[in-house]
């Protein structure tokens, strides 16, 4: 499926079953995870550990109401951001805070 939150020329997609599994395990839907990409201070980093067949990345950014920092795993294909996983993880928050000092 394709979804969009207004990211320039990019749109989002994900596997619906993976989305449900992610929400059950981590309490975050992929729809919610899109908002991390709208954070002007977001941090994008390569996910070298999981980039065997295609490049994968992390996006560390604020959630919709700025109450937490999301870590979103994704890949990029033909102007589409395919979300693979998302959640609130301490390591992602630490990377975000180191890149955006107060």
Which residue ranges define each predicted feature?
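Ribonuclease/tRNase effector modules and their secretory precursors
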Residues: 1-102
């Amino acid at each position: 499926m394709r979804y969009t939150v207004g990211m320039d020329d990019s749109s989002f997609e994900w596997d619906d079953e993976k989305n449900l599994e992610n929400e059950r395990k981590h309490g975050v839907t992929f729809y919610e995870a899109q908002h991390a990409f709208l954070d002007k201070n977001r941090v994008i980093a390569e996910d070298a550990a999981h980039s065997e067949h295609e490049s994968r990345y992390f996006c560390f950014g604020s959630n919709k109401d700025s109450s937490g920092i999301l870590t979103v795993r994704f890949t990029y294909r033909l102007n589409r951001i395919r979300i693979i996983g998302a959640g609130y993880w301490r390591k992602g928050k630490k990377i975000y805070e180191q890149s955006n000092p107060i």
